[in-house]
Design a protein with these regions (language model features):
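Helix-loop-helix connectors at the membrane interface of multi-pass transporters/channels
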Residues: 1-2, 106-135, 246-252, 257, ...
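Membrane-interface "cap" regions at the ends of multi-pass membrane proteins
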Residues: 1-29, 58-63, 67-79, 85-86, ...
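Inter-helical loop and helix-membrane interface segments of multi-pass membrane transporters/permeases
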Residues: 2-5, 34-38, 71-90, 103-162, ...
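Membrane-embedded translocation segments of transport machinery
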Residues: 2-8, 12, 168-328, 332, ...
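Loop-to-transmembrane helix boundary motifs in multi-pass membrane proteins
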Residues: 7, 13-14, 21, 137-142, ...
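Transmembrane helix-boundary motif of multi-pass solute transporters/channels
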Residues: 10-48, 241, 257-260, 264-267
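Membrane-water interface regions at transmembrane-helix termini and the short interhelical loops
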Residues: 34-38, 64, 79-80, 86-95, ...
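C-terminal membrane-solvent junction of multi-pass transporters and transport-like membrane proteins
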Residues: 87-90, 346-358, 394-451
Length: 463
């Protein structure tokens, strides 16, 4: 396989692109829900500890492997150990599956942004609005194809001219928008029909204060698993994306600083997402108002925006534009990972590869978008939930494949290649790898056990 010609221009371009991949829709619709459900500040403390230990280990491994091998997932694992090429193939299949539905979610968000731009905030707050939209045989497909087209156009233009250029302005704007909405949420105040007055500041304290009431060993372990799964999925590890992005990093870039900056950006945005959503929902709906996933973003929050009056339309616009940026940056990285692997496998050029993949995923996105209408199915998943086409793809890729891949990769690096394979790359230019001892312990002993537990829990084997 030929060495890659594409690369990021420097550390800033890489960090912003990688942070864009890590900052996805999960930061907006899952992190706040888990924080509210799992004891507020208690969840935040556990999450931060995991990011600095467990997340750091997996993120460091993926990026270092990518730069050392100068290959995407399939080529990278084959170069490390030819017999482990199968792990590269498994890793490649994760974004292949995710790409079938990520543009659909991006399309939903784009639809809501249009709704707020056109002054239909009150209509979006109606109970049946979201269900009516996703069960339509036309509208979800149109918006999914639009989102997929924008994603493909950016990837088509390459690493520097496409991905890096977009990330350099989109991620700072996203950060500013999140901060603005979070600050506004703290100023909110509302008195409900029963005469109870709640403020945004009270909601913020509810978010920050560790709630240990009724905490048992079983409850603590559940919070730990929730925080671990959120952190794991948030950092874009074990899906080949960071291996691909790592392969674009120049030799003189300090990976130690880069990993730290990616962690800080992703965790910071997740924290601010909680700060902008939890206080707002608390003010208008109390502690019972937090939903998870699509119900939070497309049902609960529109009701909150409607309750804000005229200001709600403007806040809704800012929020859904923020969500578009978060989803688009992740969608770009998913398609880029697939593109890079296909370019290596078939020795094809970028533009031809992207055009073919675009045709495939335009069709796939349309099918998944119609999974709530024409192609509606209900399948009981092993974790006990009932899912449609989108949920099935998400379950297979996120709950089954990613933890399993992470488990195998920690065993490969920790026991077959040995941790020095990654450590040598982290110290390539004479840099001091400060968390070297922590990395050795995590990659060999702690991470494999944690990934096994997460795999058993996410597949429903361990309740």
């Amino acid at each position: 396989m030929e060495k890659k010609a594409n690369h990021f221009s420097g550390q800033l371009g890489f960090v912003l692109a990688a942070a864009g991949s890590a900052v996805g829709v999960g930061n907006l619709w899952r992190f706040p829900y888990l924080a509210a459900k799992d004891g507020g500040g208690l969840f935040l403390i556990i999450y931060l500890v995991l990011v600095l230990t467990f997340g750091f280990t997996l993120l460091t491994s993926d990026i270092a492997i990518g730069r050392r091998t100068k290959q995407s997932a399939i080529g990278a694992y084959e170069k490390m150990r030819p017999k482990w090429k199968f792990l590269g193939i498994l890793t490649f299949l994760v974004p292949v599956l995710i790409m079938t539905y990520y543009a659909v979610i991006g399309g939903w968000i784009t639809k809501y942004a249009v709704v707020y731009f056109t002054g239909q905030a009150q209509a979006a707050a109606e109970d049946s609005y979201f269900t009516t939209f996703i069960t339509s045989p036309v509208s979800p497909v149109v918006f999914a194809l639009l989102f997929m087209g924008v994603t493909a156009f950016i990837v088509y233009n390459g690493v520097q001219d496409g991905i890096e250029n977009v990330s350099k302005w989109m991620m700072p704007v996203l950060l500013v928008l999140v901060v603005v909405i979070a600050v506004y949420s703290l100023t909110l105040k509302h008195t409900d029909a029963s005469g109870i007055t709640r403020t945004g500041w009270q909601g913020f304290l509810y978010y920050l204060t560790p709630n240990c009431e009724g905490l048992s060993v079983q409850r603590f372990l559940q919070i730990l698993l929730d925080a671990m799964s959120q952190m794991f999925f948030s950092l874009s590890v074990s899906m080949g994306i960071m291996i691909t992005y790592g392969s674009y990093v120049k030799p003189d870039v300090d990976l130690n600083k880069a990993v730290n900056q990616i962690e800080i950006f992703d965790t910071g945005v997740a924290f601010l997402a909680g700060a902008m959503i939890i206080p707002a929902v608390y003010v208008f709906s109390g502690t019972e108002g937090m939903g998870a996933g699509p119900s939070l973003m497309f049902v609960s929050l529109p009701k909150v925006f409607a309750a804000m009056g005229k200001a709600g339309t403007f806040v809704g616009i800012l929020f859904f534009v923020t969500a578009i940026f978060a989803t688009l940056s992740s969608c770009i990285s998913v398609l880029e990972s697939i593109t890079a692997n296909c370019m290596e496998i078939f020795h094809a050029g970028r533009r031809k590869t992207v055009l073919i993949l675009s045709a495939i995923y335009l069709a796939a996105s349309a099918i998944i978008a119609l999974g709530y209408s024409i192609f509606y199915v209900e399948v009981k998943l092993p974790n006990g939930s009932v899912g449609q086409l989108l949920d099935i793809m998400d379950y297979i890729s996120n709950s089954v494949m990613m933890p399993f891949i992470a488990l195998l990769s920690t065993l490969l690096i920790g026991w077959i290649m040995t941790p020095d394979y990654v450590i040598d790359e982290m110290e390539r230019n004479g840099e001091h790898f400060r968390r070297k001892k922590l990395y050795r312990v995590m990659i060999r002993y702690v991470a494999p056990v944690m990934m096994l537990v997460l795999f058993l829990q996410s597949t429903g084997i361990l309740s």
